[in-house]
């Protein structure tokens, strides 16, 4: 008779260094943040680099806030198992790896002295972080340079760099390379701006400011990997299969991309030499300008999501994988990507098409359940950020409307069509209707108010009201773009009369 999970846990050894055969390594990387993303992305990258090259660097994790505990890390000597699951070249792929790159985990508050000791060590060279979009902020209330530690992440970092500067008397070779992973524009530049403000606020000497400016490098980065995290439903089965208990199991997709931009203090060749990721065979791009790669990601990956998910949902699909197995929606997505988005991008066609191929594999990943309704959140602002640049770029380049991006506007308007408000999770949503089934329309109040007041009008009036609302399109009046208003009006009329499935089927057959 099989043992119950509780009995297995009692009889099972917890994952530790004796199981992983981890090698002791000098700490070269300090990582602010202990979450699933960094462990499945950055720590994985350094783990593979240790295996494939002579980098030989350990990571020390820093818990930057009071909330949470590092008990599980200490119980497992910072060892954990990572599962990468996805589609590669149209085939399922799964990789299971014991991650040994993390050598310690400390709390910036409770373990302050040890944290500072790591931050001022001879071997430290890199700092990575993922403190969320709200983490890289300047707060003048964080005004005590002697706090143990300061409250904000940039405040902590300013103090740490200052202690490092003091310990090594401003030595040029003791500067650090900072690689923030926060999802904000120009994250490295913004982090440096915050530190400069704290230097001013705290009245720190000019010598320190010069040292930061000359010998520390703040590299803007772009990260891309979907990380579902701890597999709660499968954990017991996995531990039984592996023969050890692991409370830090992490899961992510196979695809991963890190784009790292060098700064003025750090020649590109030196950055590539110090971080031998390419030698390790990893998908990391070192560049003098990360913006074209961000543009590619936003317009191809995020833009394709936004362009097809609402039409796909109204046509009867519920997640991305189903959508990709629907031949009509698959064609819709591929036509949008290859014929309407990629021609407007600054990177080479070959580079963009290779990325698009990987995106399609990611959309086919059966291990990640991308619910279309979840993706639909705030679709109006998403369309502006992700699809509008491609739409306008196409119109400018070819002097005609992009067929599928144009239809995506009509699909969005149809998805948002509702005059019924309801309370949900303490807020207000609109209630849409898909073939008799209600769904929530979630967006900012101003957006919901607009659709509540206008979506019940005639197709012509509704279309003009939406396209001429410059707040939705970055100041642009789309009602003046070629014959867009007439085309959208026809689409809205057709969708109302025949339904999304019939209209989108005809759209694909027209090619």
Language-model region placement:
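Substrate/ligand-engaging "lid" and interaction regions
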Residues: 4-511
